[in-house]
Amino acid sequence: PAQYMFKDVPDVANIADPVGYTIEQMDKYGIERAFLALNTFSDMNAEARDRFPDRFVFDLPIDPNYGMDEIARIRGLMKEYDVRALSFFPSGSYPQVAINAKEMYVFYAFCVDNDLPILVNAGVPGPRYPMAPQMVELIDEVCWFFPDLKFVMRHGTEPWEALAAKLMLKWPNLYYSTSAFAPKHYPSAIIHFANTSRAD
């Protein structure tokens, strides 16, 4: 868990209607639509989809260790949910799978064929797992091999955020998500990139 990194983490365990509470918070802060990680071990995703179909879209976390069986699972869930992206946590997979590992190539190809972006944690992970699978330099090879892949770096890319910005200049389909950061903590290299390059 990465809770050690955050202050005043809200306790939502005792909320009777988590989906309704989420909608209330979205309305409070002017959020029209939310991107949810599709968790097949919970009924909450189906509830969110059915109660508020216009308010939620889904990214589907994948485990590349399951190979083609995982591809079959993805296809099945895409028929049930409005899946807009796949997502991958390299350091959190078990066994760990690096960003540029051969196990990932079938998923990158799937994303290209289905016009889906892939959201990939990059940089030192918040949870206390080894960081090697998420080193930003590994993204360079993937972008070279899959020039049509929409690859989104998420959760900071630190301490290689300057390299992340440089790679975005190099590869037109490489993007950066500000996930896991409050705006006051955005890395300066990313702010500079946003203000000077591809800002649209």
Tell me the role of every PLM-derived stretch.
Residues 32-33, 39-126, 130-133, 170, ...:
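Active-site gating/metal-coordination segments in enzymes
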Residues 14-25, 66-78, 161:
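Short, acidic/polar
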Residues 16-21, 43, 135-137:
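Well-ordered, non-membrane alpha-helical segments in soluble/globular domains
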Residues 24-32, 52, 113-114, 145-149:
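A structural motif corresponding to the C-terminal end of an alpha-helix
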Residues 84-85, 98-200:
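Catalytic pocket-lining loop regions of alpha/beta-barrel enzymes
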Residues 1-36:
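An N-terminally biased module of ancient metal coordination in phosphate/nucleic-acid-related enzymes
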